Every structure is written in structure tokens, then in C-alpha cells.
């Protein structure tokens, strides 16, 4: 994690979460649990050295790893599990299923599991270089002057892929015989404490320590010719530089920088994959002690993984042959720089060459999201090496609406350190998809069945959880590099919502969530000494109605290496181990013993030549020894250990040499000086029994108690072991050393410890709950403990409603049910919780003697009554918290009383006559006003009405906030609200809020004043001159119906005009109304709004608004139509652009019976679908119904009735000019047969062909069938040829201009037979008006006049038709 305060890199790299979906686990191999320390160096290991390098499993030729005091987090293997929870979250269940077969590799040692397999993500083997130097047959001066080549060119190019190299050794005998010795590289098994102290000092202080016991781990030196040093020219020691000089220009390097896809899934992810830096460095001989060179890396690179302590793995460069430091490392992580400062090694040796092989990491802080072609570069000296990679972060785990991601972001592990086992951090992204989740819960658990050596743990003692809320739309770093300053810390909001489980788990209840959260879990490792620990932690997000999303993270361990080479030397060493089976031979599973002193003496001179202390894994190494015989002595053995038998078996590398032995160094290291020791073990224990007679002594009939926990501790109180008694009450601690121990017995549930040491027989009496046991060369089976069953008692009584508030239970007062009562012990710890029953009773059972605290929760709406009011503790109230004592009997005296305090709310409703919003002395209350009381949720609680004085009151109310609503009384209007400063005198309006807080609230008033009423009306008159205005001579019309509607269209009044035409509506409020006049029979509506004067007619329907005044301006006029001289011009202009095809088929049957009186009734009904009714009745009774339906919907109905009793020139000019581009073809074929019987024998053949062609470009097809029946009876001898040519040329942009100017002058009418019915365009029969009567004295002139008029009309249409054609 990057420390953003001081810009110092602390740690950052965590594992990126799943590559599979729903449930995945990432397995890393990290840190120093398998420390493969060393360098890609010059000289190789001999065969014996390879064997000596093994720790506990030499026969397997496999390097094993001891527990590290300081595990580092390096690079990890990726191992995944996939799980999909198919259960809905309502059940809150999880199922974990493992997939895949992987093996965890820790250094060279594997962890094999049935369902998990992993490969070492960053396992570095020590590489040794080859030397082609061959010895000359004899030494020459030239040879002596030759510069020492620590490594030839070939040595600078080891097989980096194989991590192995072969050494061509020099001759090893004095006769200069050539011997080619080849050896493969191996790894040295060490514990991390071996590299801790010195490495940290070097990193921090750039110092060089020569303390062997504290030295960094170096490799055994390579096999070399005996006299090789005689051929080396050691440079004269030069004085150190007076000041440090940058010698980057004197450094040459051959470097590779490789992106490593650790899990080989073709996806590169920071902290999951890594960079491999390998370089062979040549140092110019001009370089002096104190000079330095640098390694600079780009900001996309960082030099340690999850563990900030791992930085020491990129530390000093040492010569593995003699352990000398060539250059010390100093890190400047803020500037991405490593500075290497040379020691005097470069002053004493020429042609120094060094090799480094580091795993370095990608910095997710600078790579927040997936990105292609990200550059990584490292500059060693002045040479820069670059590489690029496409970074592809995995997606979050998403299952329906649930989404989650997680990674370990910091781990510091100290294996074998009980006081400080280390810690780790996991960062979890909760709901990164920002979905709306219901009942969202996050479960974090440090457990997986496939990882039994999991050293993670989660519990409230060691775990700290931080929770941050992510702003909407914020982009989270996909490498889990979180800047918490940009987030909101909401940890305190969720502290009470974190529940820790017994199985190393914690559950965080987020409730309903619609944003993302970052959860950081910081917890400690479990103490472990395992050589192959793993860390696994699972996370699961669940919510209602969605499947859970789960994943996990896992870690394993390995390390880095670097080094250089110089003069080869010899070493003595090997191993001190605990020989558990005491057979004197090292076997698999037997561990090393640390802190044993090893001293080496020259066996010839008895001079001490070296000393070492075994490391924690039991290994030791004493360097810089020439060939010869040496005595090796072991001392300072751990207390209580004894030496195993020596020289057992025939393998000197596996047997024990004893406390003192002589070994020989002859041209190679001798790593066979071992010592086996063992510790004698003893047992401690005995018996736990039920002491039924409570005498503290085991009797024959008393039986053991099974399942009792017994704990063994050392003298310092540290827990060593825990066991439980068996079915017979027996227990035993085994494999114990001599010493003093503490034994603690846990009191079994329901029991009480018996008397301690009652008798003189220590094997039969009880030692109590805690005792001391001593082991001194023998078992101790005397530690017993007795218990008897604890008697149980009850505590409780009663919770009642103290209606009279006197603090005592009265016979009429009843219990309160559902009251929560809590029982606590003297320490305040909750023991039980219960609720009172329906009668107010409660009881706690199964209690032992003791003092208890009882707490009563005040029920909602109640107040505790007074405490201890009487002398009878059985009926008085003990209050909400009291103490109860149980002493060998039940205690049923703990009571608590409560009462309900109630209050009133109300005041006054008055008539505010002056409308000032304030109650005045002379203003009186309004009775009968409805007042409603509601709670805060608008639920109606009560309704009252004001009394005769305007007062109202709501009683028996609890504390709280209420709403009061006043209903406006009929005929009143609410006055102004809160006009004054006196809340008790002003008006609170129709709706107000009242608060009751331990007192009545009588301040809620409402004032009203009487609403003024208004009138509406005026006049309906006979408009004799039809000018639309009332003239002084025109009179009113009586009994005209007038209807009044409100704004909603509801009828609220109906009246009729009086004898003077007047009407009126009274008692109206201000508002909008509609007045409707019903037209009197036989009258016609006069023109409306002809002037702005209020004397004009307003029409049949009038909208009017009354605003604080009467309105007497609503008039209407009617006139009677003149029946003698009807001059009617009806212009119907309708523009409708309507294309209509109108076929007008008109069958006209003209039957004419001509007596001497000829009634020629030519009734032609021509229907052309345009609702244009031109009905013209002349003497010839010609009904021309031109019904042309064009989409113009224009109804022009021109009815002109001309009676034969009047002289009327019926000049019917029907001009239906409807411009609609409407080509309406109307073929009106009218066959008119006129049969006329007359005294003068005249046949009147009225043949009327009506051809109506109307072309109308109209999209609507209108078929107009018109049947025209022309029956004419005439008494005259006339040949009536009725040739009716009707051309209906409807050219209508819906411009229908129908001028029906009927001027009909009829003198006398010949009596005619009236026609009974005709058909309109709705096919409904209707009677036609008669055109004359028998007493009119009419002659045939009318008939002929009508015929001529009709003929003229036909000719006009015919002419138009021809023109159209």
C-alpha cells in the first residue's frame, strides 16, 4: 500500500481476484517460508556439498524448508476454485465446491491436496557457473602475475532457463592430474531469521557487518583445486575513496527483463504475475571501496510484493564461497532506486563479476485499470532494459445482482513467533456494480477445506475491519490499490452490524445497499511452525432474491537471490537434530535444534579456529578452514536433552558424531559433523469425578465426569495443551519434559467445585480448579478434581400497570404483557432475556446462588411508577433496574410497575367577523365544526365537533406529534393564518400540527368568516327586428327555461323567465358557471354578441365567471321566422380538401294524374354524401336533397318551405361550392313516369333524366343513392315533359356555398293531393308539409311556375355538367 502522506512505499501488491466466475480462489507462493537464497554465481557445489545442503530429507534429494521467523510475500501461484450458489439468498446458504487439481509448491517441497494443485510462481534455484580454467603442468611466474578471473565469460552466461550450471573444476591433487568434477546446483534450506537481522541493518544503514552469527545466508563454497589460491593474484589493498563516487560508467551488464505469466493463462495481472530480472555484471578494476552504482526502475515497477519486509530479499551482494559482502544495498522506494556501495572486496580482488536474479513486481498504483503496452524498464548502471505487457485485470465475480472482488494487499508473517506471528490485510470490493441490493450481507471466512494448514484467522480479538463507502460513478482500482481519502469512512455506522462466528468468520450486515463499498480486513496470522503454511480467506456477498457471489484468495511462499564470487574457501558444518525415536539416525520428520554451540579446534595444535551457533533449523556452518584435521565439539545443549547413540548405521552424513569427533577437510567442504539429541518425555494427569456427597474425596461409588476441559500451562502461564476427559472421567497429557506445570479444570456446566484437599491421600482428594504438577524424571498421575451438581433456583414475579400511580400493586390493576426483562450477573454480563406473559408474569429458571441484576424495559407509551412506596416488597415496584439475591431458595419478589401518562389537545373554532385572523373579545365560537385528529402517518385517530361555544378537545393522548384538520363549516371561509404573535389567539388554518410533550396542548385554533353570496341573471326578449339587440319596444319572453351549471358541468339550478322575460339565480359563490337557455318552440336564436353592449344577445350557452360581485348581463333574444316571404341565403363555405367519389343514382318516378287540377309534385331526393341538404319546396314540391358526404363534414341544410297561400317567388339558388378537389361522379338517372288522367285526355309524360356527374378527387368513397319520387296529379290536359338534368358539380375544398333564395309567388293553387311521406338520407320516413289546400282557389299557374323554376335549375346544373365534361 502506498503511504500517500510521506510518499513512501509501504506495500501495495495484492492478488487480483478470480479468473473464473462466481467463486474463485487465488493461490500464491510467497515469501521466505521457502527461502531460495543465493546468487547466479561462479563456482558450483561439490557432490558432498549438495548432500550437506539438505536439511531433513537428504535421501529424497529434495530441499525442505523450515519455518521462517519472517515470511515474506513474493510471487504467488494462481489456484482457483469455482462455486456457484444456486440457492436464493432468502435461505442464506453457501455451498463451496472445489474444482481443479493443483499442487502447492513451497520451494522444492510440495503440498499435495486432493482438489488443489499449484506450481511455484517464483521459485529461484541457485545457479553455479562453469569454469574452463585448467591447471598448467607447472607453475610459472607468468601464471602468478595473471589477474584472478573470478568467473570467465561462460560463467556470465548460465542457463537461466534451467537455473542450473556445470563447473569444470581444476585438478585436485598435487601431481596436477586433471579431474573434471561436475555438479548441479542445489538449494540451501534455511529459516528466515538467518537473513533477518543483518539484512535489515544493511537495508536501513548501508552498513557491513562481519558478525558471523548474524551474517546473511550464503551458499557453501564450490569445489575448487587445492592450490588454486596459489595461482590467484590478490590485488594490493588500495585505500578507500575519500568520497563516494558514482561508477555507473564503470559497470557493464548483460540484462534480461521478462514478463512472467505465473499461472500460464495468457493474461498478465499485477501482483498475480511478475517480472524476472536477470543480469550478469562486470566491475571495472578502477572501482574502489566506497564507490557505488545504481539500479533504477520505472514507476510501473516495485521491488517487493505483499510483504514490505521482503525488500531485504533484494539486499547485499555476497560471495557465496566465503560469505564476504561485495556490495551493500540501500533502497530509496520513493524514487524507485537501489544504490549498491562496494566494500573493500573490490580493492582486494580484480575482475569482479556479479550475477543477480530477482523477481520484481508490477505497481498497480500506476496501472489502475486494464491497459495495453504498459512499459516496464530497469536501468543497471547506464544500461536500460525495457519490456511491455498488456495488463488485463480479471472481472469481478457477478451472480445475478450480487458482485464482489477481493485481494490480499499486505502480508507480514513471522513463522514460529508466538508474540508476533505477523498480520495480513485483505481488501474487498462489495457491490462494485452498484446494484440495488436488499438485505445485503458480506461474509469473510479464513477457512477452506482443501487447506488444512491455513494460518489465517478472523475473530474480534485480533481482527480490525474498516468499511468505506464509494461515491457513485467512482472507478475503483482493479489492482485493489485503494486511496481511502477519496472514499467515505462509514466504519462506525456498521460496528454493531459486524458479527463474528466461531469458525474464523465475520458477517457484515449492509442492509439495503445501492452503492459500492470497500471493506479492509486487517487481522493476525495464527501462530505456526509449519514449513508449508498457507493462507486462505473466502468472501461471499448475498442479498435477497439473488444468488450469492463468492470468491477467495490464497497465498504460499518463496524468495529472491543475488550474489557474486571471489576466492573459494572450505567449510565445516552440518546439523543438530532432535532424534525423537532415539536411534541415532536422521529420519524424515525429525527437526533441527537451534542455539547449540559448535566449536572447531585444529586437532594438531588444539587451537580454536571457529565457532558457530546452530540456527533454528539446526544447521551451522564454519567457513575459512584450510585442509587438515579438526575436532568438532557441541555444547550448550537445550535443557533436559540427552545425546543419542553415535555412529549408528553406515552413512556418516546421517548418523550422529556425538558431543566430540574428529573430521578431515581435504580439498572440499566437510558437512558431515552432526549431533543427535533427544528429550525424555513423561505423562501428567488423572481423574475428574462427581463428588455426590460433597466431601472432596473420591469414593468407590462415585463416577467420573466426561467431557471436562483440562488445560496444561507452563510456569509462565502459556497454554501448552488442552484435553477433555474421556467417558470414565480420565485425562492425560503426554510427551512432557521435566518441569513445573499448571493444570486448570473448567467447571462443567451445572456443577460446582467440591472441597479442595480434604483428605491426606493426594491421589484421592480434589486438587481444585487450578493446581500445580511437577514432573521430575517420572510421570505424575495425581492431579484430580471433583464437582457436584449445582442446585438451581428461580427468580421473577410481575410487571403491572399502576393506574393510580401509587407504586403498589392493587387488586384491580392488571399485568402488562410483552415487557422485556433482562437478567445479568454481577459483572453486567447478560445471562437470560425473557418477556412477560399475558398476565404480566415472568420468571428466570435454572439459577445458582448468587447476586443478579434485573432490568425491565419500559413498555412503549408507559412511564415507570414510583419505587419502594410500601413496606411489602412483594407488591411494591422495584423500578426499571434492581438487584436480586438467590440464597438457597427462589426469589419471587422482583416487580416493576408502569403507568400511561395521557394529555389533551384542542382549543377553539370562532367566527372571525373582522377577518383579521385573531380572536377578538366580541367574536363568538362556531358550534358543530368537525375536527379530525391524525397521527404522523395521516392515520385518523379521533373526530369531534365543536360545542355550542366553539370549543373542542381530544383526550387521552400520549406524547407525540399530531395533525389536526378543521372542516370548513357550511357558508364560511377560512380566515388568514397566524396573523398575530399570540399562538393562542391566532388561527392555525385548516390543517396544523400539534406536539404533546409531557403537557396538554390547548393552542390549536381555527377562524372562519361567513362567505358572501352573489346573484346572476337578466333577460330573455323577443327580438322582433332580428338585430340581436334589446330595443325599448321589444318585450320579454315568458317561461323560457334557463339552466345553471357549475364548473364541473353539474346542474345546480333551473328556473323560467317571468312574464317580463326576467330570470335570476341567487346565493352563488365566486366561481365559474355556465348558463343554458332553452330555445322556445317556433322561435329562432337571434344574432349573438353583435355589440359590446350588455343589451345584446349572449347565445344559447354562456360561460360566466363571478368574482366578488353580481352579474346581471346574461341576456338572450329570439325571433319568429317570416313564413310568407322567405328570403334565405345560406352560404356554407367549407374548405376541406376532401377527395370523395360520389355516385348519385337517382330513380325518379313521376306519376302524374292530371284531372283538371294538376298537382305536380316533383320530389327529387338526391343523396350525395356531403350532408348538404338543399330542400326546396315550391308549388312543384321539389325536394332536392343533395347529401354529399365529403370529409369536410359540412352540413348545410337550407330548408325553404313555400306555402301556396302566399305569393312567394321561390327562387332557390343552391350553390354548393365545395372546393375539395373532389371528383365526385354522381350519376343520377331519374326515370319519371307521369301518368296523368285528365278530362281533356291529356297524357303527361314526365320523363326526368337527372344525370349528376360529379368528379371529386376524394380518398373517401361515398355512395349516394337517392330515390326521387315525383308524383304529380294534374286535372289539366297537359303534356308535362319533365326533363330534369341535375348536374351536381361539387368542387369543394369543402367550400359549400348554398344560396337558397326562394322567392315564390303563388296566386291560386290548384287543389292537389298531398304526398304522405318521403325518405331522408338516414332512410327514415318523414311527412312533408302540404303546399296548399282545397279552399285556396288556386289555379294551374302555380304548377307551371314551379315547373319552370325547376327546369331553370336543371338547365343551370346541366350547363355546369357540360362545362365540367
Swiss-Prot record:
Keywords: Calcium, Cell wall, Peptidoglycan-anchor, Repeat, Secreted, Signal. This is Serine-aspartate repeat-containing protein D. Residues 36-568 are annotated as: Ligand binding A region. InterPro entries: Adhesin_Fg-bd_dom_2, Adhesion_dom_sf, Fibrogen-bd_dom1, Ig-like_fold, LPXTG_anchor, SDr-like, Sdr_B, SDR_Ig. It holds the Pfam family Gram_pos_anchor. One of its GO terms (cellular component) is extracellular region. Interacts with host DSG1; this interaction increases S.aureus adherence to keratinocytes. The keyword Secreted applies. Residues 130-145, 174-183 have a biased composition (Basic and acidic residues). It is a peptidoglycan-anchor.
Amino acid at each position: 500500500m502506498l503511504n500517500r502522506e510521506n510518499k513512501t512505499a509501504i506495500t501495495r501488491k495484492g492478488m487480483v481476484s478470480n479468473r473464473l466466475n462466481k467463486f474463485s480462489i487465488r493461490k500464491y507462493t510467497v515469501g521466505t517460508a521457502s527461502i531460495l537464497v543465493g546468487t547466479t554465481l561462479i563456482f558450483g557445489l561439490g557432490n558432498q556439498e549438495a548432500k550437506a545442503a539438505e536439511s531433513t530429507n537428504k535421501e529424497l534429494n529434495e530441499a525442505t524448508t523450515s519455518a521462517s521467523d519472517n515470511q515474506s510475500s513474493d510471487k504467488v501461484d494462481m489456484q482457483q476454485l469455482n462455486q456457484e450458489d444456486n440457492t436464493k439468498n432468502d435461505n442464506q446458504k453457501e455451498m463451496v465446491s472445489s474444482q481443479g487439481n493443483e499442487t502447492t509448491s513451497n520451494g522444492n517441497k510440495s503440498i499435495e491436496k486432493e482438489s488443489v494443485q499449484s506450481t511455484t510462481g517464483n521459485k529461484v534455484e541457485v545457479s553455479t557457473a562453469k569454469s574452463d580454467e585448467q591447471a598448467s603442468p607447472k607453475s610459472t611466474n607468468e601464471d602468478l602475475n595473471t589477474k584472478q578471473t573470478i568467473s570467465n565469460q561462460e560463467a556470465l552466461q548460465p542457463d537461466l532457463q534451467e537455473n542450473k550450471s556445470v563447473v569444470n573444476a581444476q585438478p585436485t591433487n598435487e601431481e596436477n592430474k586433471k579431474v573434471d568434477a561436475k555438479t548441479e546446483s542445489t538449494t540451501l534450506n534455511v529459516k528466515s531469521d538467518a537473513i533477518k537481522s543483518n539484512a535489515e541493518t544493511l537495508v536501513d544503514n548501508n552498513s557491513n557487518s562481519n558478525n558471523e552469527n548474524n551474517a546473511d545466508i550464503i551458499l557453501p563454497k564450490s569445489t575448487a583445486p587445492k592450490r588454486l589460491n596459489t595461482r590467484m593474484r590478490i590485488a594490493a589493498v588500495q585505500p578507500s575513496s575519500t568520497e563516494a563516487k558514482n561508477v555507473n560508467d564503470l559497470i557493464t551488464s548483460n540484462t534480461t527483463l521478462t514478463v512472467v505469466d505465473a499461472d500460464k493463462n495468457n493474461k498478465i495481472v499485477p501482483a498475480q504475475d511478475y517480472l524476472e530480472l536477470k543480469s550478469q555484471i562486470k566491475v571495472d578494476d578502477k572501482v574502489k571501496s566506497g564507490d557505488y552504482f545504481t539500479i533504477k526502475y520505472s514507476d510501473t515497477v516495485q521491488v517487493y510484493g505483499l510483504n514490505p519486509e521482503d525488500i531485504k530479499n533484494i539486499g547485499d551482494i555476497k560471495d557465496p564461497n566465503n560469505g564476504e559482502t561485495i556490495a551493500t544495498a540501500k533502497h530509496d522506494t520513493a524514487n524507485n532506486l537501489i544504490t549498491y556501495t562496494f566494500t573493500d572486496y573490490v580493492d582486494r580482488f580484480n575482475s569482479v563479476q556479479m550475477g543477480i536474479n530477482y523477481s520484481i513486481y508490477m505497481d498497480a498504483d500506476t496501472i489502475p485499470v486494464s491497459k495495453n503496452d504498459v512499459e516496464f524498464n530497469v536501468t543497471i548502471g547506464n544500461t536500460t532494459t525495457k519490456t511491455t505487457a498488456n495488463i488485463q485485470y480479471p472481472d469481478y465475480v457477478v451472480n445475478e445482482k450480487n458482485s464482489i472482488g477481493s485481494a490480499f494487499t499486505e502480508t507480514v508473517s513471522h513463522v514460529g513467533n508466538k508474540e508476533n506471528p505477523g498480520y495480513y490485510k485483505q481488501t474487498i470490493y462489495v457491490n462494485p456494480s452498484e446494484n440495488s441490493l436488499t438485505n445485503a450481507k458480506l461474509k469473510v471466512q479464513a477457512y477452506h477445506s482443501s487447506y488444512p494448514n491455513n494460518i489465517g484467522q478472523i475473530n474480534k480479538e485480533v481482527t480490525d475491519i474498516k468499511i468505506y463507502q464509494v461515491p457513485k460513478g467512482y472507478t475503483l482500482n482493479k489492482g485493489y490499490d485503494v486511496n481511502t481519502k477519496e472514499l467515505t469512512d462509514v466504519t462506525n455506522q456498521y460496528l454493531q452490524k459486524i458479527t463474528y462466528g466461531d469458525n474464523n468468520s465475520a458477517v457484515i450486515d449492509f442492509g439495503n445497499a445501492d452503492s459500492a463499498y470497500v471493506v479492509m480486513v486487517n487481522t493476525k496470522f495464527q501462530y505456526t511452525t509449519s514449513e508449508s503454511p498457507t493462507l486462505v480467506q473466502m468472501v461471499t456477498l448475498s442479498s435477497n432474491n439473488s444468488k450469492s457471489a463468492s470468491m477467495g484468495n490464497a497465498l504460499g511462499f518463496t524468495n529472491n537471490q543475488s550474489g557474486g564470487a571471489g576466492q573459494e574457501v572450505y567449510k565445516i558444518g552440518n546439523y543438530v537434530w532432535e532424534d525423537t525415536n532415539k536411534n541415532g539416525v536422521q529420519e524424515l520428520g525429525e527437526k533441527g535444534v537451534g542455539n547449540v554451540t559448535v566449536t572447531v579446534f585444529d586437532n594438531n595444535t588444539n587451537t580454536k579456529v571457529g565457532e558457530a551457533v546452530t540456527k533454528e533449523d539446526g544447521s551451522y556452518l564454519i567457513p575459512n578452514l584450510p585442509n587438515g584435521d579438526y575436532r568438532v565439539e557441541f555444547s550448550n545443549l537445550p535443557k533436559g536433552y540427552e545425546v543419542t547413540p553415535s555412529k549408528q548405521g553406515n552413512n556418516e552424513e546421517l548418523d550422529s558424531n556425538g558431543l566430540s569427533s574428529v573430521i578431515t577437510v581435504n580439498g572440499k567442504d566437510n558437512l558431515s559433523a552432526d549431533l543427535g539429541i533427544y528429550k525424555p518425555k513423561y505423562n501428567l494427569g488423572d481423574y475428574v469425578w462427581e463428588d455426590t456427597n460433597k466431601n472432596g474425596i473420591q469414593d468407590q461409588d462415585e463416577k467420573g465426569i466426561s467431557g471436562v476441559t483440562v488445560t496444561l500451562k507452563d510456569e509462565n502461564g502459556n497454554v501448552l495443551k488442552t484435553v477433555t476427559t474421556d467417558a470414565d472421567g480420565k485425562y492425560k497429557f503426554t510427551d512432557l519434559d521435566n518441569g513445573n506445570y499448571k493444570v486448570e479444570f473448567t467447571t462443567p456446566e451445572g456443577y460446582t467445585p467440591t472441597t479442595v484437599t480434604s483428605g491426606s491421600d493426594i491421589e484421592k482428594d480434589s486438587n481444585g480448579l487450578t493446581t500445580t504438577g511437577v514432573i521430575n524424571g517420572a510421570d505424575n498421575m495425581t492431579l484430580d478434581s471433583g464437582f457436584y451438581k449445582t442446585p438451581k433456583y428461580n427468580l421473577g414475579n410481575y410487571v403491572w400497570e399502576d393506574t393510580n400511580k401509587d407504586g403498589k400493586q392493587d387488586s384491580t390493576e392488571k399485568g402488562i404483557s410483552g415487557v422485556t426483562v433482562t437478567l445479568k450477573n454481577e459483572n453486567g454480563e447478560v445471562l437470560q432475556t425473557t418477556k412477560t406473559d399475558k398476565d404480566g408474569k415472568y420468571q428466570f429458571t435454572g439459577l445458582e446462588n448468587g447476586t443478579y441484576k434485573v432490568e425491565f424495559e419500559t413498555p412503549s407509551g408507559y412511564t415507570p411508577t414510583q419505587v419502594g412506596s410500601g413496606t411489602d416488597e412483594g407488591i411494591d415496584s422495584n423500578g426499571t433496574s434492581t438487584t436480586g439475591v438467590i440464597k438457597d431458595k427462589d426469589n419471587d419478589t422482583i416487580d416493576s410497575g408502569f403507568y400511561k401518562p395521557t394529555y389533551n389537545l384542542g382549543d377553539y373554532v370562532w367566527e372571525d367577523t373582522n377577518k383579521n385572523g385573531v380572536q377578538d373579545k366580541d367574536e363568538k365560537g362556531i358550534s358543530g365544526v368537525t375536527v379530525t385528529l391524525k397521527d404522523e402517518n395521516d392515520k385518523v385517530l379521533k373526530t369531534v365537533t365543536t360545542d355550542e361555544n366553539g370549543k373542542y378537545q381530544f383526550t387521552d393522548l400520549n406524547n407525540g406529534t399530531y395533525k389536526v384538520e378543521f372542516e370548513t363549516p357550511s357558508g364560511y371561509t377560512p380566515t388568514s393564518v397566524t396573523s398575530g404573535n399570540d399562538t393562542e389567539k391566532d388561527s392555525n388554518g385548516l390543517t396544523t400540527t400539534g406536539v404533546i410533550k409531557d403537557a396538554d396542548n390547548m393552542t390549536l385554533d381555527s377562524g372562519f368568516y361567513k362567505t358572501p353570496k352573489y346573484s346572476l341573471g337578466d333577460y330573455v326578449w323577443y327580438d322582433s327586428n332580428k338585430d340581436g339587440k334589446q330595443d325599448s319596444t321589444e318585450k320579454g319572453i315568458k317561461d323560457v327555461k334557463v339552466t345553471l351549471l357549475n364548473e364541473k358541468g353539474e346542474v345546480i339550478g333551473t328556473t323560467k323567465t317571468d312574464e317580463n322575460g326576467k330570470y335570476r339565480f341567487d346565493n352563488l359563490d365566486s366561481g365559474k358557471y355556465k348558463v343554458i337557455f332553452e330555445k322556445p318552440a317556433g322561435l329562432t336564436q337571434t344574432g349573438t354578441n353583435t355589440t359590446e353592449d350588455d343589451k345584446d344577445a349572449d347565445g344559447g350557452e354562456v360561460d360566466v365567471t363571478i368574482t366578488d360581485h353580481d352579474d346581471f348581463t346574461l341576456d338572450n333574444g329570439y325571433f319568429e321566422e317570416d313564413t310568407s316571404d322567405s328570403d334565405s341565403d345560406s352560404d356554407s363555405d367549407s374548405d376541406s380538401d376532401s377527395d370523395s367519389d360520389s355516385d348519385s343514382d337517382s330513380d325518379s318516378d313521376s306519376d302524374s294524374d292530371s284531372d283538371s287540377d294538376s298537382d305536380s309534385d316533383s320530389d327529387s331526393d338526391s343523396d350525395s354524401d356531403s350532408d348538404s341538404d338543399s330542400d326546396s319546396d315550391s308549388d312543384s314540391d321539389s325536394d332536392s336533397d343533395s347529401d354529399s358526404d365529403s370529409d369536410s363534414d359540412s352540413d348545410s341544410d337550407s330548408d325553404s318551405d313555400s306555402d301556396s297561400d302566399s305569393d312567394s317567388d321561390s327562387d332557390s339558388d343552391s350553390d354548393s361550392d365545395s372546393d375539395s378537389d373532389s371528383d365526385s361522379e354522381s350519376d343520377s338517372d331519374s326515370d319519371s313516369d307521369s301518368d296523368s288522367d285528365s278530362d281533356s285526355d291529356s297524357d303527361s309524360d314526365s320523363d326526368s333524366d337527372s344525370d349528376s356527374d360529379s368528379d371529386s378527387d376524394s380518398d373517401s368513397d361515398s355512395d349516394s343513392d337517392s330515390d326521387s319520387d315525383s308524383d304529380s296529379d294534374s286535372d289539366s290536359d297537359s303534356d308535362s315533359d319533365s326533363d330534369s338534368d341535375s348536374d351536381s358539380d361539387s368542387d369543394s375544398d369543402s367550400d359549400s356555398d348554398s344560396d337558397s333564395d326562394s322567392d315564390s309567388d303563388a296566386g291560386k293553387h290548384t287543389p292537389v293531393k298531398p304526398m304522405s311521406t318521403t325518405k331522408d338520407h338516414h332512410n327514415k320516413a318523414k311527412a312533408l308539409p302540404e303546399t296548399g289546400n282545397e279552399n285556396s282557389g288556386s289555379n294551374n299557374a302555380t304548377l307551371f311556375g314551379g315547373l319552370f323554376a325547376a327546369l331553370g335549375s336543371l338547365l343551370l346544373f346541366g350547363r355546369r355538367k357540360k362545362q365540367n365534361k
